[in-house]
UniProtKB/Swiss-Prot annotation:
Cofactors, names only: Mg(2+)
Name of the protein in question: GTPase Obg
Protein family per UniProt: Belongs to the TRAFAC class OBG-HflX-like GTPase superfamily. OBG GTPase family.
Record keyword Thylakoid present: no
Biased composition (Acidic residues): 362-379
UniProt-annotated binding residues for Mg(2+): 173, 193
GO cellular component: cytoplasm
Function: An essential GTPase which binds GTP, GDP and possibly (p)ppGpp with moderate affinity, with high nucleotide exchange rates and a fairly low GTP hydrolysis rate. Plays a role in control of the cell cycle, stress response, ribosome biogenesis and in those bacteria that undergo differentiation, in morphogenesis control.
Disordered as annotated region, ranges: 362-385
E.C. number: 3.6.5.-
InterPro entries from the UniProt entry: G_OBG, GTP-bd, GTP-bd_Obg/CgtA, GTP1-OBG_CS, GTP1_OBG_dom, GTP1_OBG_dom_sf, OBG_GTPase, P-loop_NTPase
Pfam family, one: GTP1_OBG
Location within or outside the cell: Cytoplasm
């Protein structure tokens, strides 16, 4: 299935149902009291995280989602039926933004997580609500409010502990094949990897971590060169970045300059991503003599001003890979991810005293003093026997 990590949809919640103006009519009771019911609330639009999905391709074709409208109130104090909610399933790891304001509405980071993106309209009030000792036959009602309509931007961001960085053909896909059961395509030409891929590294029966491989970066990626930087967002959730440097580039380019290109593109993309822990990993050591590989790695680290530990590996032969993975596992255990705050329960709204209805009542009361026939204009009265 094609990997699609961005989509824009329109979420329209249902409108609230209108209140009803009705009067009770029974045998020997020609002038019964009001019995108009309230309308029903409009349906909401929800997002549901599903771990069985891994792409947003479905929303490239189906873009409009509309919840059901609440039914109007009826006589005999019958409240209208609430509109049905609509549930949109998205992959775990989806970030939800409001296209109009660019506000982050939420992150779908765990299976079965729910997020309301459009609230249904409030129900209108029937004339029963307006009866009083001085107004025994009210012909007033309120209409339901409109449901929210939002254009939502969905961005799928892979959930991984470790992210791979490097130029094309630095050996990122070979590394993932060496440490996990993932089998990304490997070839001797640039941009073999066209979409992100994930691999699970199992250290023992109880410990494991997830590695994300993204297409390689080149100079000018921030300006759209190559595959651009659109896949860098998949590394924002990672705890540590592994920066792979080819010790013996086929094109005889300078490894120091290659490393600086990656750092520059990271900084141009996001300060947050550039500030993440980054480990230097020199790959393809098997193409050189052990002494030459060690001296070349040491020289590159000095020129880069790298004072921390670096790693010398051969992903193809799996030399030094196991030790690197154990160090990564130890780092992840020592720096656990922050737990997301528990979701607050939606606040219950008492619709009788909602601002919308209160404003409507105040407006109608003001009109009473100007119009002696306020109860005869535009009112549909239902008489029931």
């Amino acid at each position: 299935m094609k990997f699609v990590d961005e989509a824009t949809i329109l979420a329209a919640a249902g409108d609230g149902g209108n209140g009803c103006v009705s009067f009770r009519r029974e045998k020997y009771i020609p002038r019964g009291g009001p019995d108009g019911g309230d309308g029903g609330d409009g349906g909401d639009v929800w997002l549901l995280a599903d771990e069985n999905l891994n792409t947003l391709i479905d929303y490239r074709f189906e873009k409009n989602f509309r919840a059901e409208r609440g039914q109007n109130g009826q006589s005999c104090d019958c409240t209208g039926k609430r509109g049905k909610d609509i549930i949109i399933k998205v992959p775990v790891g989806t970030r939800v933004l409001d296209s109009g304001t660019n506000e982050v509405m939420g992150d779908m980071t765990r299976h079965a997580q729910r997020l309301m993106v459009a609230k249904g309209g409030f129900h209108g009030l029937g004339n029963t609500r307006f009866k009083s000792s001085v107004n025994r036959a009210p012909r007033q009602k309120t209409g339901g409010t409109k449901g929210e309509i939002r254009e939502i931007q969905l961005e799928l961001m892979l959930l991984a502990d470790v992210g791979m960085l490097g130029l094309p053909n630095a050996g990122k896909s070979t590394f993932i094949r060496a440490v996990s059961a993932a089998k990304p395509k490997v070839a001797d030409y640039p941009f073999t990897t066209l979409v992100p891929s994930l691999g699970v590294v199992r250290m023992d029966n109880e410990q494991s971590f997830v590695v994300a491989d993204i297409p390689g970066l080149i100079e000018g990626a921030a300006d759209g060169a190559g595959l651009g930087i659109r896949f860098l967002k998949h590394l924002e959730r990672c705890q540590v970045l592994l920066h792979l440097i080819d010790l013996a580039p086929v094109d005889e380019s300078d490894p120091v300059e290659n490393a600086r290109i990656i750092v520059t593109e990271l900084e141009r993309y996001s300060e947050n991503l550039a500030s993440k822990p980054r480990w230097l990993v020199f790959n393809k050591a098997d193409l050189l003599d052990p002494e030459e590989a060690a001296s070349r790695a040491n020289a590159i680290a000095k020129v880069l001003g790298w004072e921390e530990k670096y790693y010398l590996i051969s992903a193809a032969n799996r030399d030094g890979v196991k030790a690197l993975c154990w160090d990564v596992m130890a780092f992840i255990n020592a720096h656990p991810k922050e737990q997301a705050a528990p979701e607050a329960a939606p606040e219950k709204v008492e619709f009788m005293w909602d601002d919308y209805h209160r404003d409507q009542l105040q407006q109608e009361e003001a009109e009473e003093t100007l119009d002696d026939d306020w109860d005869e204009d535009g009112v549909e009265t239902i008489y029931q026997r």
